[in-house]
Amino acid sequence: MKALSTADYIVFLVYFIVIVGYGLWIYNRKKKETESSNDYFLAEGSLTWWAIGASLIASNISAEQFIGMSGSGFKLGLAIATYEWMAALTLIIVAVFFIPVYLKNKIFTMPQFLNQRYNGTVAMIMAVFWLLLYVIVNLTSILYLGALAISSISGLDFNLCIAFLAIFSIMITLGGMKVIGFTDVIQVFFLILGGLITTYLAVSLVSDEFGGNGILDGFSILTTQAQDHFQMIFSKDNENYAELPGLSVLIGGMMIVNLNYWGCNQYITQRALGADLKTARGGLLFASFLKLLMPLIVVIPGIAAYVLYQHGGFQTEMLQDGSVNPDRAYPVLLNLLPSGLKGLSFAALTAAIVASLAGKANSIATIFTLDIYKKTIRPEATEKKQVQVGKITVVAAMIIAIMIAPFLGIDKKGGFQFIQEYTGFVSPGIFAMFILGFFWKRATSNAALFATIGGFLFSIFFKFLPGFADLSFLYEFGFAVPNSAGIYEIPFLDRMGFVFIICILGMYTISTIETRNGVKTNGLEVDASMFKVSPSFTVGSLIVIAVTAALYTVFW
């Protein structure tokens, strides 16, 4: 691959100076305000709707999207965009039903909600779990994939890239949630602009290769040259059905993935929890619109790379250890860009990685400081001391991630799949615990413990069940398909759906028995007026729903 030119490094350096300079300016201007732990962790009351929306997208779109989803676009096609388009609908649900509950009860963190709704045992178990999940799964995978992409594009040493990303992310994070929120506004601009330019040039290259004229011809050529890559819903005989199993991407496990991620995720929700309800909802709606556009940036380039590869392009660039590695699609396309533009796109990718790392590190610090340190280690800690502990936690988490990232086998599994699989072992139980905790006053603490621990154990059970039982009878219903060895396995998303149903039924049974025996619960007061939305929000939501329905109708 071509190395970065001097012009590329200049563009990248300008970006680096702008981001760091702006972050430091915000930090110094708000230094007194960040002495408050609420302001450090949440940017309380200071983020606008557009800053919240931009921060949500910048923190969500990272290496696993740019590298992983482009790679999935190369392999699976447009169907992988269901993660983005279903997220657009999910954000509306979260804005209407979840955020009002958090704000009314002044919830700063997810463990705080669990402590208030259930008890300290449930909250502490989940706080420890989230710390382990964020550090071992999320932080490491983003760090590893980000370094891999930057190393592939720039030619720099992989370990040096990991160190650079960690240090840069720490610098951004130490300013607190306020710095992250407002630097995200700059980063999301570079991110989307660079991604759109990459998509434009990639599709234009397809057009040129096939004698077309412009980007519209290029897109038309993509749909004809790779018809199998423009199907949103796979049938059972599709070789990729196990990854995206039919209608489960609409009404099954995919909704659990998205609702858990966007509604029960400290890393995401804290961007909206530092605002009033109207502002928070506006931010989530803005993010929903941006989600509809994300496949243009993270999926279409992968499909373009696939078409070019199938017709003789990138025959060596796409190879890794002698076989095709779909995750190389986006770095390959970036290396086709002219000097300057390549540096801009490289900066956009780096922006996505750093924003996600910084946000994740801040969430780790928030949970450890407010829900472990403050409650069990030093309850008398001052506001200033809590902020100091949070900053130390950021550095410690990043050091741990640097040390273990190369040894987790992320490269073999693929970053996007790595994150989805390992979070999927616990997300059904977490979502069941949250959804009943929100809207059913009789849910008890023991029922929540069942969902937390039982959900994890049942996920393991269904994962390894094919090794002990013949599941071919499930094929007729689309709940099992044969792998390369002929063994029938339950698709990942269906497995999540099964576990979620078990957790809901288990929680209902345990709660019903306990409440009949006199066990008291801490049910939340849910008022229907909490869920009323403004006319402008209603109109915006209907537009998102209509566009999503149209996309699925066209590409079904």
Q: Predicted segment positions?
A:
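Membrane-embedded helix-loop-helix hairpins and adjacent transmembrane boundary segments
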Residues: 1-556
